[in-house]
Regions:
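Short runs of predominantly hydrophobic/aromatic residues within well-ordered alpha helices
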Residues: 117-120, 136-140, 144, 178, ...
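Histidine-centered, metal-coordinating catalytic motifs and their short helical/loop contexts
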Residues: 169-198
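Flexible secondary-structure boundary motifs
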Residues: 135-172, 191
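Short, solvent-exposed segments of well-ordered alpha helices
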Residues: 107, 111-114, 127-134, 169-176, ...
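Generic structural signal for hydrophobic core residues of well-folded globular domains
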Residues: 124-127, 131, 144-151, 166, ...
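C-terminal structured domain segments
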Residues: 192-247
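Active-site-adjacent bridging/hinge elements
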Residues: 111-120, 156, 182-189
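Charged, non-catalytic interaction/linker regions at domain boundaries
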Residues: 1-135, 222, 230-278
């Protein structure tokens, strides 16, 4: 298989089995752990593989490996600013820790459960494989919505204000512009950005997508990495209680803000040709 032959990164989950030749609950358990590890890597790095990721399940008996099942995943889309960043050892360690925490979180006795947080995480992982840049931007904005619980009719205003907990003050104009892209896609008005090719508009979309992805990913990673944050972000009632706290109380719980502009530190239009912008 070409994907396996060319692969230089393997995420492995294994356990001892009394029935290694049977695809049963043990197989499902190691598959889930491998998947959690992979999701952890998505949160730890903006990596994009050269081939579609593959999940192989099987057994090892008498020194021989027997592959019993193969699943192909949709491939994460390369970024425009840094298409193929290296996956470094710190990324792997972070991915493993996040993967372990995801397994713990799935069975944690949280009041109100954890559906909302896992749904938000699902939206993020799906967005990483979405081809069109405005659709990715839309989905990453939805991830942020999932973590701030905006009220109906006040979504744009609260998208600007409530994200201060993640990125600090001073970014209201930026967040408003991001929300405008989200709203355009939601109401099928993305022709404003895509119908005719304008290089400056497309470059601006590149920056916006990179920024909103960075906010969504780093916020999710911090929440999953810190079990003290789980009771505040796992579900809708928890978020309502969190929003009812004072700003200083919320800041104390969250910690230092994320710098959203880190995502575009390497942005240089001279290295971005029109073909990368969809022309």
């Amino acid at each position: 298989m070409e994907e396996v032959e060319d692969c230089n990164l393997f995420l492995l989950s294994k356990l001892a089995s009394a029935t290694p030749g049977v695809l049963d609950a043990e197989s499902q358990a190691v598959q889930q752990r491998a998947w959690n590890f992979y999701v952890g890597l998505l949160l730890a790095s903006k990596f994009a593989p050269a081939h579609r990721p593959v999940l192989l399940t099987g057994s090892r008996r008498d020194g021989e490996i027997d592959i019993r099942q193969q699943q192909d995943f949709d491939s994460p889309i390369p970024g425009v600013i840094r298409p193929y960043p290296s996956v470094v050892p710190d990324d792997i360690r972070t991915a493993a820790r996040l993967g372990e925490n995801l397994e713990t979180l799935a069975t944690a006795p949280l009041s109100g459960g954890h559906w909302r947080l896992f749904r938000t995480l699902h939206v993020y992982t799906e967005a990483r494989t979405t081809g069109e840049i405005v659709d990715r931007t839309h989905q990453y904005c939805r991830c942020i919505d999932g973590l701030i619980l905006p009220a109906a009719g006040k979504t744009r205003q609260q998208f600007k204000g409530r994200t201060e907990i993640f990125i600090g003050p001073g970014h209201h104009d930026l967040m408003g512009e991001l929300y405008d892209v989200r709203s355009a896609v939601e109401h099928l008005h993305e022709n404003r950005y895509l119908e005719s090719f304008d290089r400056a508009t497309r470059l601006d979309l590149v920056k916006k997508e990179a920024i909103v992805e960075h906010i969504a990913r780093t916020a999710l990673a911090r929440i999953i990495d810190d079990d003290a944050l789980w009771p505040h972000f796992a579900n809708t009632p928890a978020l309502e209680k969190f929003r009812a706290l004072t700003a200083s109380e919320r800041t104390k719980i969250w910690g230092d803000p994320i710098d959203p502009l880190t995502a575009i530190a390497d942005f240089d239009p001279q290295y971005i040709h029109d073909g990368m912008l969809g022309r």
